[in-house]
Structures are given as C-alpha cells and as structure tokens.
Amino acid sequence: MFGGKVKFSGRVFVKICGITNETDGRIAMEAGADALGFNLVPHSKRYIDIHAAKDWIAKLPEEMCRVAVVADANWEDVCRIGRLPFVDALQLHGSEPPEFCRRLADAGIPFAKAVPVSGSKSLASLPNYFTDTMILDSSENGEFGGTGKTFPWKFAPEFVRHHRGINVILAGGLDPRNVSEAVKLVRPRGVDVTTGVEASPGRKDANLVRAFVEAARQPFGSVQ
C-alpha cells in the first residue's frame, strides 16, 4: 500500500532510503528509482525533520513516491505525517502491532510494514499487518534497519511464493554487488537500499545509486 503512484508490476521496484537532501533525491530519481525514503526516526544517523525538509521534498517530481519512515511513533503523529501533502506513504519500521496497522488501513493511509528476519521461524508465523506491501529487513544486535548487514536470503523465497498477494520488498545489506543475486534467489517485487549506496551516513554516492538500480533490474528485466 504505497499509494496510487506505485504499480507493482513489470520491472523490479527500487526504493532508495535514507534521503537527507534534495541533491540525493534527484540523484536517485535520475538513476531510475521508483521511491525515496525519508527517515523520521530520531536516533537514526539519517534522521531528518520532515517539516524543515518539506520545501525540497515537495519540489521533487510528482511521479516519485515519497515514503516517510517511522518506528513505534504514537498514533497521532503517524496519522499527521501520513496525511502531509508531500508524503505519499508511510513505512512502519518498528514493532507496531497488527491492531495499529488495522487502524491505519481503516484510516485510508497508505503504508508498508517492515519485519525483521533472522531465520525461517521469523517468517513462518507473521500476523496479518493489514497491508499488501511488506519489507523484509535484517536485524543486528537489536538494531533493525540501516545496519548494512544481510539476512540469510534462503529463508525468503518460500515466503514470497506462499504470499502472492503481498508485494514483498527485500532490504538489508543490499548493494550494487549483491542485489542481482538477491533478486534472482528471492524474486521480490522490489528492493530497498540505504547503506549500500552511501558515501557516508546520510550522503549518497551517485555512481553507487546508478549501479544499484541497474543491477537490481538486470536479473530478469521484469518480475512475474
């Protein structure tokens, strides 16, 4: 549920996350990314104040999906952010329970739910999060997302096969060198990257961004 701007069909969907400035946003857009992620989690190295950044985010081309990443924020703040005119969708990247997600779906706010993957059991008994878009990400020493570490991809293909109604986005330690292999193995609808295309935390490397987008779409050309 990334909103009407995203159609999960055809080529591999690519989201570049941890965007902190307009220049990096345009680099990702020109490289062919489908979505940009803005981290609103206060302790993150890539945190931005969404209101301070609203002018340059709003100036990004309308065809680009703008995703606000939140984690365990309170209900009022999540709804307020999700209804901002320059935010197209939310990404819940904390331990938000299914009931919270159900309320968000009932409110008509587009969102994706990220879940940590550490083994087969972490995917075997996932509850209903009331969204058609889920992000499988790695967890390292209690830190979830933006770790630069992969999780064992062998656990993901079965989940993708058994959840055809879910748009699965693969994240966690992806970079231009491994994303092609990951897409071949897992067959996700999309991929999400932060650390793997950075020159430093919060600053993107244009060459890495371009290489990542190209490599992500190389294996099949399209996703069935």
Predicted feature residues:
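Conserved N-terminal beta1-alpha1 strand-loop-helix module at the mouth
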Residues: 1-224
